[in-house]
Structures are given as C-alpha cells and as structure tokens.
Amino acid sequence: MDQTVYLEVNASQKPAIELLQSMGYTYISPEDCEKQRGSKYHVLLKDILRGQLRKLNRYTYAGAVNEFSAGNIERAMDELDEPLTDGLVRTSEKVYDALLMGKSYPETVGNGKSLSFNLKYIDWDNWDNNLFHITEEYAVESQDKQHNARPDIVLFINGIPFAVIECKAPHISEEQAVEQMIRNQQADYIPQLFKYAQIVVATNKNAVKYATTGTPKKFWNVWKEENDTFLNAALATHITDRTPTEQDRNIVSLFSKERVKELVRYFVLFDANVKKICRYQQFFAINEITSGNK
C-alpha cells in the first residue's frame, strides 16, 4: 500500500467508519453487500430492503391488519429502481418522492375486491424502526462495463444508499474528492448509485464539503455546526481516545440519525431540474423559526 492510500484509509476512511459505527450504523462488508445486490451494477441491498418492507408495512381492511403480498413487496423493490432515461436529477426526484411518500399497491380483500394501500420504504414517524448500515470500498460498475468506481463509504437506510463519502489523505485537497464524486455521477460512470443519494461528502480529515446529487463543484458547501451542545455531547460520547477532527465534527453534524431525518425529509428540494440541499445557515435559521412557533 503506497503512502497516500495508507493515509487515506487510516487518517480518514477508517476513523469515519469507526465513528459511524459508534453512532449506530451497522457495518456490512463489501462481500456481504455484493451477495445482496445481484451484480456490481445494482446498488440496493435487496435482502435488507425486502425484510424492512415486510416489517414496516401493513394495511387494514374490515378491522383486520394484513401483510402486503410477496408480489407487491418485490414490485415495490423493482419500482424503486427507477431507470435513468429522464436523466439523473429527474430520476433522483422520482426516487426521493417514493422515499418520502411511499407507493400505492393493490391488494385483494374480501369477496375478491381489489383496493390500493400505501407502502412505505422508510418509516419517518417511527425512526427507530429503520435500519442503518455502512460499508466501504463499494465497487459499482457502469452499465456498459467500461467504467467502475469504488466509493470509499456508502451509508444505507433500509438497504437503500442515501449517502456517499469520498475520503482523501490529509495532504490531498478535498476538492479532488469533490471532482471524483462529480465524475462518478456522470452517465458513463455510476449514476445508478447517486439517484438514491441525498447527501454526498468529500473529506480529507481536516477539510470537508457536502452537497447532493448533481451539485456543481462551485456549490459544494462547508457545514458549520451552530448547536454546540449537540455537537460536543456527541463527540464526547463517540470519540474518547483522540482529538476530534473537522471530519468527525461534520460526520456527527450530517449523519447523526435524527439529523439525517431532518436533512433528508425537510431540507432537500428540487427546483427546475436542479436538486438542492440546504446550507447550514438555512438549516439553523428555519429550525429556530419553527421551534419558536411551537
């Protein structure tokens, strides 16, 4: 292993994974991920997703609570995997809408009648019902098999990849990670991963930028945590054997489970085929306004 790769792994990637595990994300090896994916082109962790769709979803008819049919569970998984024919951002919007609102599927009820019921991919109201995983070196292949990429860290909710982190050695600018992330989203690389991603992060331990799918380089932002009580308590809980880095502070700020819920549910938007995620100033200003109205 050359020195740059060694530093990337040991100064950035490994500490990030350890911190995320301490924050409640379950590590799953690349090999175990691949068994669930079906191929290196596909990116959903299907066994986890299937199990969560069964667990999270019931419909009520005539006072009886019922499970969705196995066929509808499979259909819901297939339909979440939207084709990229409309381009990455429009496809990402379709996926985002499904993650927020679910999809409706017909079930046969009494006397052979068919009624439609809503099926959810993420339980926004009972957040602890969801499963959170991380993996590393997530090998993904382009559709024509001419390109492949291996994002350093991918985060999942219920087997759905919602965030990607690209790590660099401390002496390599985080801008290189930004450029790599943007390249990987191009049509001839691995856009099928990024149609699910809501948060993307470029880090070299000492400097961090974040964005969302399709964000041009000039609009990648830095996050400055304004809730010092939250941040300091989390760092004290999860990092006990070293001095926290800028990367640590950003991981806590962006990927603490409750913060993920807020950012993804309320602070991602689509405007004229542009996908946006809030700047930190917007996040804290809106939270201050809404908390004052309670």
Please tell me what each predicted stretch does.
Residues 2-11, 15-294:
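ATP-dependent helicase/translocase motor core
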